[in-house]
């Protein structure tokens, strides 16, 4: 009886162990299935960031059709095709990212400029990315104007957000009278700065710097550092003078308006050239200028913000400008993307250099993509 009892007990223990083991295996399988489901449904911020960057690159290139491919089904239904052909995006900088539930919100500073007149806008652009089935799509966009710079008479003025009042940045009379061309390596011959008119302007992403170009037959490029506290100091000074005063005094005060342009850095003077646009790098360490010149065509120059010096990479020396045009494409965080385009299609002598290139903004070395 004892042996029989022991056998039954042993069998019971074995059966119990088998049941427990099976239960554990089933539980592990369910957990793995649940983990797999959670992984497939989780939100990948890196993938969403890539969508945001690619979308902005398409907008910069004005490739509207490809940019629409990133819209969600609902957003695609509400798109409006109208656009300002003169006001273009020349750069953007991702300033903030946040994951909210199963979505990502990306905030960018976007620099826009008019290519036909001196007007620039610095906007905060917000993009919401959601996962639609297995793809990451843009479900919502918002744009808030941070700053505008524009021409009024011979002045460049600044408007903050929706303020009615504006502040003087600089007037054309305050521009330097003479400057050196970066082509003059001896720095001997100063050239008269063109003061016929302002041609183009553009903001840095922080809004503290404004790239300015003036032109007649030559083009002058400068960077003005903006200090908005000067406007507050100016207003306080006027308040301290007390009330009263007639219209002549008011006109005199207006004429003495203190500019918020704190200092100006001469960047370059391009002989017989026209500036097509200017754009700051995302890190705000460099300024890229695209210009055109008779007999040369389109070309780029990249300057350091600190001091306005040319970088060591000279596009004019690296490429045969009698055969190719050099045009700006886009920025990555520490690189400049540009295109080398043949002037004559089918020119087989330059196939090794035409195409897409990338310039490092750290060591200023270029490579073909």
Write out the residue ranges for each language-model feature.
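C-terminal motif of bacterial Sec signal peptides marking the signal peptidase cleavage site
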Residues: 24-27
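Bacterial signal peptide processing site
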Residues: 29-32
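Short solvent-exposed beta->alpha transition segments
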Residues: 43-44, 50-53, 57-107, 295-296, ...
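Beta-strand C-termini and the immediately following turn/loop, strongest in propeller blades
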Residues: 159-172, 211-217, 288-295, 337-344
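Structural motif
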Residues: 167-180, 217-233, 295-304, 344-363
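Blade-terminus and WD-like Trp-Asp/Gly-His loop motifs, strongest in beta-propeller folds
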Residues: 199-210, 277-287, 326-337
